[in-house]
Regions:
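Short-chain dehydrogenase/reductase
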Residues: 98, 147-155, 191-199, 203, ...
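Oxidoreductase cofactor-interface core, primarily capturing Rossmann-like NAD(P)-dependent enzymes
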Residues: 176, 187, 216-218
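Short, basic/glycine-rich phosphate-binding loops at helix/coil junctions
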Residues: 183-185, 222-223
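Hydrophobic, Gly/Ser/Ala-rich alpha-helical and linker tracts in large acyl-processing enzymes
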Residues: 185-198, 205-208, 214
Length: 341
């Protein structure tokens, strides 16, 4: 039995491949390298000592996905990471985001149906909750009040998967709503390597620490939070990857539709993260306070009870280890995967 990991060369996908391989699964990776490096998969093999099948494929194209399933009849489940994911870019390129992010899932579902594959894990996000009325956030909070096209593509895909699941009682779907993944594999061989200037806090801090950027821009210090900066639920990417292995095992019980938050249940402010990173790297991180960004919310963290009770999953790593592992990756790879060239 093999797991198809769509977008498996990406940040979360590559860490998930490691956890699947270490758990004894056969893995088939598909990626078009739009926002990933071929170096990643070599390093996954180096870390695990295991080989896997790879297809350079565009998951919006039927012929690419059909080829994978035709040549790998042992695929019994799909984990779907493939997506455009930059919030700011989604605002300026909504057509590209809706086309790519919705079609990736629709094409995979269509081909799965033809090949009698019945298990699907979807990489969703806590942004589907919009600005929550309260925290912590449970899975029954309302969704859909998203603030950007990226988040809306995730909410729309969740709705599509819910409808398809209702229509097909043989289909099992896990909607995993991630909070804020950070950190890197303990080896320092793989980590987060965004193209251009990072959109997310942790890779930005890491680039400042390694001297590639001058200072961190903190957007807003007038939120109703303990220090005025935005609070988020940061989760170690290795913990998040383990959650996908637990989700695959859940689908093997023929659970139908399963929705679950993957977060720690603890919120940390932007300044908390900066100070934790300063401890990890042993140097000050310069930052400047700027105006709030449109669409940002004050506070967002998970209630992880369902994941604990129904997946048997608990986040193991705290903010100190997340920062230490991010720094280990960045100092070993100051130019990301380009350092290997």
């Amino acid at each position: 039995m093999a797991i198809l990991v769509s977008g498996g060369a990406g940040y979360i996908g590559s860490h998930t491949c490691i956890e699947l391989l270490n758990a004894g699964y056969d893995v088939v990776v598909a990626d078009n390298y739009y926002n990933a490096s071929p170096v990643v998969l070599d390093r996954v093999k180096q870390i695990t000592g295991k080989d896997f099948r790879f297809y350079q494929a565009d998951m919006t194209k039927h012929e690419d996905v059909e080829k994978i399933f035709a040549e790998c009849p042992d695929i019994t489940a799909v984990i779907q990471f493939a997506a455009y994911k930059a919030v700011g870019e989604s605002v300026s390129k909504p057509i590209e985001y809706y086309y790519n992010n919705l079609n990736c899932t629709l094409v995979i579902l269509d081909v799965m149906r033809k090949h009698n594959c019945h298990n699907f894990v979807f990489s969703s996000t806590a942004t589907v909750y919009g600005d929550p009325a309260s925290v912590p956030i449970t899975e029954d909070f309302p969704v859909g009040a998203t603030t950007n096209p990226y988040g809306t593509t995730k909410a729309m895909t969740e709705r599509i998967l819910t409808d398809v699941c209702k229509a097909d009682p043989t289909l099992n779907v896990a909607l995993l709503r991630y909070f804020n993944p950070i950190g890197a594999h303990k080896s320092g061989l793989i980590g987060e390597d965004p193209n251009g200037i990072p959109n997310n806090l942790m890779p930005y801090i890491a680039k400042v620490a390694v001297g590639k950027l001058e200072k961190v821009h903190v957007f807003g210090n007038d939120y109703p939070t303990p220090d005025g900066t935005g609070v988020r639920d940061y989760i170690h990417v290795v913990d998040l990857a383990r959650g996908h292995v637990c989700a695959i095992k859940k689908l093997e019980t023929n659970c139908g539709l399963f929705i679950c938050n993957l977060g720690t249940g603890k919120g940390y402010s932007v300044l908390d993260v900066i100070h934790a990173f300063e401890k990890a790297c042993g140097k000050p991180i310069p930052y400047v306070i700027e105006a709030r960004r449109p669409g940002d919310i004050a506070e967002c963290y998970a209630d992880p009870t369902k994941a604990r009770n129904e997946l048997g999953w608990v986040a193991e790593y705290g903010i100190e280890e997340m920062c230490a592992d991010s720094w280990n990756w960045q100092k070993k790879n100051p130019d990301g995967y380009h350092s290997a060239n």
